Amino acid sequence: MTKSAHTTPPPDAAARRSAPPVLTYSVEQLPPFDAGFYNRARAELSKVASLTVPARDARAFEVAAGHFFRIVSVEGPQVGDLNLWNSHDLAERFYSGKTRALHATHLSTGDRLWSSFPKLRPMATITHDTLDWYGWDEDGAGVHDVIGTRCDPYTRLLLKGMEYHHCCHSNLTRALAAERNLPLEEAEVHIHDVMNVFMCTGNTRDTHQYFMKASPVRPGDFIEFFAEIDLLVALSACPGGNCGASHSDDTAKCYPLKVEIHRPRESALSGWQSPAPNKYSRSHGTR
């Protein structure tokens, strides 16, 4: 979609456009990524659980604080849509927009997944990513984005005029409802903007529209997270498969995703504790 100018540029248009960019957040005060700690913790892991997320479906699972979980490509290139909640309080959930603002449009090793207001704290830290080599390609695309929201049946109906029930939004809704024994309508309000695991995306240079391209993920690739708090996690194996052509339909070749949960040696976590909730007073200028 091209933006057409309807007004005559002012005489100082070039000067206005030449203002230098400034990073929105100065993040030097964020706790640094302690690679040594996480590497020691992941050096000796015991697998305590695993599960398979079927193609075009989703599953929810618990991960205790101090454990690692991996999302693994097992049969073919497949994108996954990830939701996170505080296991004890579904109101605290992954905040993709703030994560994007604090880190970048695409995440990798050392980045954290931040929770919603008012807690605003790290929920999980990415500790290993076999696709970190990808970086930014010639189209400006990267992997593991926090730009896209998730494919959903409402937008599908709006744009295509047809219902489809295996979009990631619906998959995640069913998974949360089943895991927590909730009515679908109650579960749905907790589904939120995702981290698009393994998805390769960017914004077009001319119109700045969101685009996707075939994921570079291959069987054996994985992304690994450290649970900073007790987590409830839901993962959908996107109906778009590798998201190289379409989504929100049954045309793409899709594959399952594997999840592994690992426990480190207890001594490896010596001195570690879950991040405290944000300490803002919540007075909002009233006292």
Mark where each language-model region is.
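Acidic, Ser/Thr/Pro
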Residues: 2-287
